[in-house]
Design a protein with these regions (language model features):
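Acidic/His- and Gly-rich active-site-bordering loop/insert found
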Residues: 1-92
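Metal-dependent amide/peptide-bond hydrolase catalytic core
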Residues: 13, 70, 151-152, 160, ...
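Active-site metal-coordination/substrate-binding segment of hydrolases
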Residues: 59-121, 333, 338, 344
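Acidic/histidine-rich catalytic neighborhood of metal-dependent amide-processing enzymes
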Residues: 97-165, 205, 363
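Short beta-strand segments
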Residues: 63-64, 120-122, 147-150, 171-173, ...
Length: 363
């Protein structure tokens, strides 16, 4: 496992570099083909290379991604390493989610007959899964159950729900004027944006844990000009599709407050919520496996972050997420995994795959 992990972490694969993604897919392909005893293939959608292995008789889809948020060149300064004093592995993308891929390979290798296991490793999850969504839906529907090898929650908890995500850009157009000579002739886009930000913040509902957060904002061109243009990005998240649709409708109802200003809202729901009921059956199976391995009880949490599990859960397909590595701090310079937990996580996934493929379709 460690040899593969070292190679995979040191094989840079930022979401924005087609060449590096292709190289990473080519690294994983022979490992996956060997584990499954059948060929995996690199499938290209646009410039993105995804790794696909379709089962002859699918019962479960192992879903993950090999793209990372780390730019080319990061490995030169921060290559894979293990701190032997605490048995912690470090490196770009190790927790999210290259260790999860290595564990999945080991889990599949433990199966006497993997002919009911499909695998999809995508290359665009970190940037919204635009080119892989159709593949995800197709393979998930064929299999009827999905296990997602994204990182675990704290302590190794699996994820049985995730908030849905909507993203927006609110653009304001006013009228430029000299800030000192003729401010009264302008329509201040910054002031209009301030009104909109207050209204946007009010769309959230803390009682329902629905967050609507203005994030990146910009306005104006020079310090002595009434701003003609302004914009703000908005991140919205909710546990239920009903709430997310309410937010979406409210965002698209925003109207200008200043005479002469124009407000345009671009965006919408990107990842529907992963609602907890969809995970119930697979979580019960995983918890039973954990007990049989002596690593129970298996904790379960809901997460505010999204994954491709949102997409399969929204289709009503039984889905369990967070079956990847135990560690912490994804997307940060202290990203790490607990090396000594990797074998047990592979065993947990292997046991779950064995139970899932050894019976009729999960309901």
């Amino acid at each position: 496992m460690i040899g593969r992990l070292r190679q995979l972490v040191d094989c840079e694969s930022p979401s924005t570099s087609a060449r590096h993604l292709e190289e990473c897919a080519s690294l994983i392909e022979p490992w996956l083909s060997s584990a499954l005893h059948r060929p995996a293939e690199v499938t290209r959608v646009g410039e993105n290379a995804h790794l696909v292995a379709r089962a002859p008789d699918p019962r479960v889809l192992v879903l993950g991604h090999f793209d990372t948020v780390w730019p080319v060149g990061t490995v030169s300064d921060w290559p894979f390493s293990i701190d032997e004093s605490v048995r912690i592995g470090r490196g770009p993308g190790i927790f999210d989610m290259k260790a999860g891929i290595v564990q999945a390979l080991t889990a599949i290798e433990s199966l006497p007959d993997p002919d009911r296991v499909s695998v999809l490793l995508t290359s665009d999850e970190e940037v919204g899964s635009a080119t892989s969504r159709a593949l995800i839906a197709e393979l998930a529907q064929d299999a009827g159950a999905v296990v997602v090898c994204e990182p675990s929650a704290d302590g190794g908890a699996v994820k049985v729900g995730r908030k849905g995500i909507a993203n927006y850009v609110v653009e304001v157009t006013g009228r430029a004027a000299h800030a000192g000579l003729e401010p009264h002739l302008g329509v201040n886009a910054s002031v209009e944006l301030a009104h909109q930000i207050i209204r946007i913040t009010g769309i959230g509902d803390s009682n329902r844990e629905t967050s609507v957060v203005p994030t990146l904002a910009s306005a104006g061109t020079t310090a002595n000009t009434v701003p003609e243009f302004a914009r703000v990005h908005v991140d919205a998240r909710s546990w239920t599709i009903t709430e997310l649709e309410r937010v979406d409708a409210a965002m698209h109802r925003l109207t200008a407050q200043l005479p002469g200003a124009v407000v345009d809202v671009v965006g919408g729901i990107e990842r529907p919520p992963f609602e907890e009921a969809v995970a119930r059956t697979l979580y019960a199976e995983a918890a039973a496996v954990a007990e049989s391995l002596g690593i129970g009880p298996l904790a379960a949490v809901r997460s505010g972050g999204g994954s491709d599990g949102n997409l399969t859960a929204a289709l009503g397909i039984p889905t369990l997420d967070g079956l990847g590595a135990v560690g912490g701090h994804p997307h940060a310079w202290n990203e790490h995994v607990l090396i000594d937990r990797m074998p047990e996580r592979a065993a947990l996934l292997g046991g779950l795959l064995a139970r899932t493929t050894g019976r009729s379709r999960v309901r």
